[in-house]
Amino acid sequence: MIIQPRVRGFVCVTSHPVGCAAHVQEWIDYVKSKGVIAHGPKKVLVIGASTGYGLASRVTAAFGSGAATIGVFYERPSEEGRLATPGWYNSIGFTRAARAAGLYARNFNGDAFSDDIKKQVLDAIKADLGQVDLVIYSLASPRRTHPRTGTVHKSVLKPVGAPYTNKTVDTDTGIVSEITIEPATETEIADTIAVMGGEDWELWMHALRDANLLAPNAQTVAYSYIGPEVTWPVYKNGTIGLAKNDLERAAQALDALLKPTGGRAFIAVNKALVTQASSAIPVVPLYISILYKIMKARGTHERCIEQMQRLFATHMYNGQTPRFDETGRVRIDDLEMAPEVQAAVREIWPTVTTANLVERTDIAGYRSEFLRLFGFGMPGVDYQADVDPHIPMI
């Protein structure tokens, strides 16, 4: 079939298998162009491995350090009349490239929150790798069925305490408008922490340790975001921010767990980027469109893959210890949060309207990057060609 992008709201409901593979290959080529990451990880588990920062971490580990990787994700295969999700095609593209390079790559498609998937993954590590020396935790999920209680928790992206009104942009139509988001209830706050907080990360790490599957000096990292004050009510001080606070609590507990064997656990605070997760957050896409324009002009713009390659090469495997901030986090949002960048954002933000959106922001770059997440707009891909969307997981 011939596959074209079809965007509904903040999601593209089609994805292109050849384009997704080309996008992954572009990331692989970037990592290889930066050279070998000396003393990098060799056996890596990536929980949330099919898109965004998780996929970029897997690519960096494999093609920067020659690591064997196990990827866990929850993606939908194609069925009659329906394409697979981009993460499905991404993971196949990655796995083909890794195996062609002689690297071990194994995939588990299922609910990472469940005991069943944890057991399957632990059995695979025991059988194939013996132990892992790096665990990446990069899940972004709208819901979690708690493995102990069976309760289904659903996360929400809302402010806490009071309604929040600010500008937002419909990235499809380019209309800039005001949006008011009502505050979360106590139940919604608790549910969001249950989904996006640190409990599941702890369950994974304790299961790995109890089964003796963590190598000496093993590291684990989870990803977070802080951002500028304009996004704080809906992010840092909102429901998702409270969940990220719980993730930081878990990082400290896991760091204490790993310290006796020379390991460490920490949070990396990443840059605002166009991802399937960030596109769903009100206000944030407009901020990203402004940020991209400023950072591209300064020559400091990074995508997921540049961020993760820099995290691995200059912090985690730099021959020394990572550089931590005052609360023990690694800050690879440093270029985004540079005072002069944020001053420029604050200057542009109040002036943006529907009429001047294209001139004042990089909405074109946002849209292009958004479509690339789904395999569209990749150079060298013939989008008029007939392609088979039904590809089994490998």
UniProtKB/Swiss-Prot annotation:
GO terms for biological process: fatty acid biosynthetic process. It is an enzyme of class 1 (oxidoreductase). The keyword Metal-binding does not apply. The record marks 75 as: Plays an important role in discriminating NADH against NADPH. Pathway: Lipid metabolism; fatty acid biosynthesis. It catalyses: a 2,3-saturated acyl-[ACP] + NAD(+) = a (2E)-enoyl-[ACP] + NADH + H(+). PANTHER family: ENOYL-[ACYL-CARRIER-PROTEIN] REDUCTASE [NADH]. Belongs to the TER reductase family. Monomer. This is Enoyl-[acyl-carrier-protein] reductase [NADH]. It comes from Opitutus terrae (strain DSM 11246 / JCM 15787 / PB90-1).
